[in-house]
């Protein structure tokens, strides 16, 4: 084997990293271009730059003539999952889900395109998602006249966004990003004094040690993604960003939102999620906690044409008020 083909990380069928720094992403869904008035849902979407490092796909549900002058829409900022190292806000796997979520919730969607590991190891994704959230918040109290002065602002958010109903969401590592963003939002102010009303953590990615044999596999594949994404993490897999129950972890009572929906599915991660929920309850956090315990698998949520997937989306969107 040539030295250039020597691998340092190989997790088929998803990703392979070579000693010379090359990365092969072996499994990615197709890119979906921007579009207006999707024939299936009526949703429109476009891609916008936020900075030289961060961009986002913004979604607008179908707006009737009557709704043009009615109350504004909730804002849903989403951080996608896939191991911190795979997929994209612009690819069909997460795009299709968000399109249907936005249509069902009647909300503006902002799906963040953050930098991926291992080329950009953590905490890059955390910083990118915080920057994207601050950009969204910077639109508060603006009107269309602001667009002439600020070329980096988006008219959909200005015209239709209700900043009293700002929500975050994320799946798996995206749910972990939500966790870390909420902790930061509890300490630092968002632009314009905007507050996060609620957040959804679907299948949140944590590495909390359990006594369950069912969770033994966490020592292997599940932990590999963290080691790939943050190889120099202080404390390794006991870093507070991935294990919120370690001794030096930030106080969960400082979560910067008023409402939280945590979703579990029927697999080995359920025990870990239950431990996190227990820690959150014991912390004294004053918000409203809702738990969705699905008798389904992780990927069922993203099968948007099935009844199971549709029902899961309805359950999650019912949280957006």
UniProtKB/Swiss-Prot annotation:
It catalyses: dihydroprecondylocarpine acetate + NADPH = (+)-vincadifformine + acetate + NADP(+). It comes from the Eukaryota. Pathway: Alkaloid biosynthesis. One of its GO terms (biological process) is alkaloid metabolic process. GO terms for molecular function: hydrolase activity; lyase activity. A motif (Involved in the stabilization of the negatively charged intermediate by the formation of the oxyanion hole) lies at residues 80-82. It is an enzyme of class 4 (lyase). InterPro entries: AB_hydrolase_3, AB_hydrolase_fold, Carboxylest/Gibb_receptor. Its EC number is 4.-.-.-. The active site is at 172, 267. Keywords: Alkaloid metabolism, Lyase. The keyword Magnesium does not apply. Component of the seco-iridoid and derivatives monoterpenoid indole alkaloids (MIAs, e.g. vincadifformine) biosynthesis pathway. Catalyzes the conversion of O-acetylstemmadenine (OAS) to vincadifformine. May also trigger the formation of additional unknown MIAs. Belongs to the 'GDXG' lipolytic enzyme family. This is Hydrolase 3. It comes from Catharanthus roseus.
């Amino acid at each position: 084997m040539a030295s250039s083909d020597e691998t340092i990380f190989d997790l088929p069928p998803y990703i392979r990293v070579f000693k010379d720094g090359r990365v092969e992403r072996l499994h990615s869904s197709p890119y979906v271009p921007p579009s207006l008035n999707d024939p299936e849902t009526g949703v429109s979407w476009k891609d916008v730059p936020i900075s030289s490092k961060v961009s986002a796909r913004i979604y607008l549900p179908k707006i009737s003539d009557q709704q043009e002058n009615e109350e504004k829409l909730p804002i849903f900022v989403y951080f996608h999952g896939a191991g911190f190292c795979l997929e994209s806000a612009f690819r069909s796997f997460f795009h299709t889900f968000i399109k249907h979520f936005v249509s069902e919730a009647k909300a503006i969607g902002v799906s963040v395109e953050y930098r991926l590991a291992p080329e950009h190891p953590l905490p890059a994704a955390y910083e990118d998602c915080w920057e994207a959230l601050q950009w969204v918040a910077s639109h508060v109290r603006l009107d269309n006249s602001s667009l002439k002065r600020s070329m980096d602002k988006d008219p959909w958010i200005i015209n239709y966004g209700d900043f009293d109903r700002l929500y975050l969401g994320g799946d798996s590592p995206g749910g972990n990003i939500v966790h870390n963003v909420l902790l930061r939002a509890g300490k630092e102010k968002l632009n314009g004094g905007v507050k996060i009303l609620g957040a959804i953590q679907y299948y949140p990615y944590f590495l909390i040690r359990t006594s369950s044999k069912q969770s033994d596999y966490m020592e292997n594949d599940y932990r590999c993604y963290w080691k790939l994404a943050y190889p120099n993490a202080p404390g390794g897999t006991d870093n507070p960003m991935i294990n919120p129950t370690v001794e030096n972890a930030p106080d969960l009572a400082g979560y910067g939102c008023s409402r939280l929906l945590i979703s579990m599915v029927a697999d080995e991660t359920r025990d870990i999620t239950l431990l996190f929920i227990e820690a959150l309850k014991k912390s004294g956090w004053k918000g409203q906690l809702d738990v969705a315990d699905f008798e389904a698998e992780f990927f069922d949520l993203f099968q948007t044409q099935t009844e199971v997937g549709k029902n899961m989306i309805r359950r999650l969107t019912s949280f957006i008020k």
